[in-house]
């Protein structure tokens, strides 16, 4: 017999201890990994609900199992909210992750061996945009495009590559690019050769929902996103489209189920519905505006302290530090800041001489710290502390002083008050 007062702490102390330590880590560390964020308690409530018990293969009104009348309501709410939030006329909320959403798009629009233009991973792209270690690089003929000397997407190069290689699909989107993408220009290039434009907006979906960053949905044939990152929802994926045919939408649905997945995670879909509603609130727009302001404020400090910021600016929630001229590796920077309770991730930079396991750069993002209530003044202080550590990575006293400052500001800005 199952009882509602069953809990992990009384049953599995070893596991519970690790979970509790993670709670402490999140509260006592400053999170600057650009792809991470904090979900609301409402989102977590949905993920811990009894919806996890329900199998619901298929789509609302067309299930392979009985007893789906209420999960149909849940999924339809998520679909309708996704369409309304991003101005789409099609949404699939079932992908378990952004990568699986991307896989569904590839299998819908392409055949193995087709040519695809994707952003070079070292220039800011993503594994699923053509990395040789990923399915995208293994199954398709990938032609990478990149950024120019100023750190911005080279649209002339992209147009020339498209003309030369005649890809069937061009991918827009990124995991480490701090500029604004000209979606209309990308669509123009795609149309000039009869290619599909597929946009992966995972990193900027929250900014787009709030009107802080341009929306690719009116320009792309298909758009995907994660529902975490800047959108601040549960970990999962989403597929969107506007102005496409019913045939395309049916193919996309079939590519998700039964093509790549079985039963959807209904508790996660409920959490997506909650997060999408939260993203429609005025407070969410204010939050996203502050995310962008905080990123700009941090860039100003790093530049003033003599650090090289790729492109010299940011127009979204993230930026890259190029540490080559500081004689530092990304791995060293990551470790030193980690000792001061500041969490970042090492990241390759354009023309990086180091391996992806070492790198010469560091990616910094502001969604999580802004979620805690950090202001521009707070992140300017934070950026200054980071510079102190990066300039003295072997000085334990500097790192300890910085850690104490971090603990103090974390105490003043709890993740969950």
UniProtKB/Swiss-Prot annotation:
PANTHER family: SERINE HYDROXYMETHYLTRANSFERASE. The lineage of its organism: Bacteria, Pseudomonadati, Pseudomonadota, Gammaproteobacteria, Enterobacterales. This is Serine hydroxymethyltransferase. It is an enzyme of class 2 (transferase). Its cofactor is pyridoxal 5'-phosphate. GO terms for cellular component: cytosol. The record marks 228 as: Plays an important role in substrate specificity. Catalyzes the reversible interconversion of serine and glycine with tetrahydrofolate (THF) serving as the one-carbon carrier. This reaction serves as the major source of one-carbon groups required for the biosynthesis of purines, thymidylate, methionine, and other important biomolecules. Also exhibits THF-independent aldolase activity toward beta-hydroxyamino acids, producing glycine and aldehydes, via a retro-aldol mechanism. Gene3D superfamilies: Aspartate Aminotransferase, domain 1, Type I PLP-dependent aspartate aminotransferase-like (Major domain). Keywords: Amino-acid biosynthesis, Cytoplasm, One-carbon metabolism, Pyridoxal phosphate, Transferase. It is found in: Cytoplasm. (6S)-5,6,7,8-tetrahydrofolate binds at residues 121, 125-127, 355-357. Its main location: cytoplasm. Pathway: One-carbon metabolism; tetrahydrofolate interconversion; Amino-acid biosynthesis; glycine biosynthesis; glycine from L-serine: step 1/1. One of its GO terms (molecular function) is pyridoxal phosphate binding. GO terms for biological process: glycine biosynthetic process from serine; tetrahydrofolate interconversion. The modification N6-(pyridoxal phosphate)lysine is found at residue 229. PROSITE patterns: SHMT. NCBIfam families: PRK00011.1. It catalyses: (6R)-5,10-methylene-5,6,7,8-tetrahydrofolate + glycine + H2O = (6S)-5,6,7,8-tetrahydrofolate + L-serine. Its EC number is 2.1.2.1. It holds the Pfam family SHMT. Homodimer. Belongs to the SHMT family.
